[in-house]
Amino acid sequence: MLADQFKRKIDYLRVSVTDRCDLRCTYCMAEDVTFLPRQEVLTIEEIIKLIDVFNELGVKKFRLTGGEPLVRKNIISVIEHLFELKKQDKILEHTLTTNGTNLEKYSQILKNNGINRINVSLDSLNPEKYKEITKWGKLEKVINGIHSAINEGIKVKINTVLTQDLSLIH
């Protein structure tokens, strides 16, 4: 069993599966960011091995994050593996934090592989402000993805980054 310096049990792990993202949010990433070379990023097999090791050490909850996890090639293999662990009662939960741009495409696959809740990063409901924050994101695509997830029975929590120039009007 893993424990922190105060002897509290560690049963949750956040796994960043990529540093890549299909948006360039002003508070997160510069437009000209240099991504890690592919050879320095964990392979899907290495991520699965890491999950298995931490599961054996007592971690029962996993959250996939990024960058944007749904742009990671073969990420569904990781989600399928987590679902297999869940079906074997080895883990309690696996979730995902996403910007929502690919959610409409993946909602049914996520639900079919045991994802019951997700966090969606959404910083404005104003299409122009959203595009300004994300550089080229389309708010409608994210909203459609959120509706798709909800229609699949996935619980959706919205994360918003409050910035100094963010007006309550937005």
What does each model-found stretch correspond to?
Residues 1-93:
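Conserved alpha-helical substructure of the radical SAM core
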Residues 17, 69-71, 100-104, 120-136, ...:
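Conserved radical SAM core fold
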Residues 75-78, 105-110:
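Distinct, well-ordered alpha-helical segments
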Residues 169-170:
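Conserved small/polar residues in nucleotide/adenosyl-binding loops
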